[in-house]
């Protein structure tokens, strides 16, 4: 069976929060994915800590791997190494402590890639106190993505509206354009 999605969970000094992330992944209705959890050399955990998590979750997922880098390589090198290991056609990065919004989140991500031929998707929602939901980026911000000079001007003035925590990639984007710049 071909794996369609790879959920990458990056950890640094917050392994204690990975349980809520893994529990959120476990609740997903979509099932054709692998989970790669990788610690980037946190100095405050032992191999025994990693072994406990592996033991707890190895049977919860069809494909599960926990990696302990041993040394800190930095976020970008760490992420690039995990992209290289990913078997899925869609990359869904999470950080330790992140949770999917609901049990259909991964299915919705996969549907978005199925419905349109895009290499990258990003979206975020702000849930306000009165339980209303505001979607980001706005339609105006989306239009800026097709106008690179206006996009860069906008993010320099108003901040970057593209959130790494809610950006998903077809793996082929990295084959076509390369990995993230490690400099």
Question: Could you say what each language-model-derived stretch is?
Answer:
Residues 91:
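Short aromatic/hydrophobic "clamp" motif used to bind/position activated sugar donors
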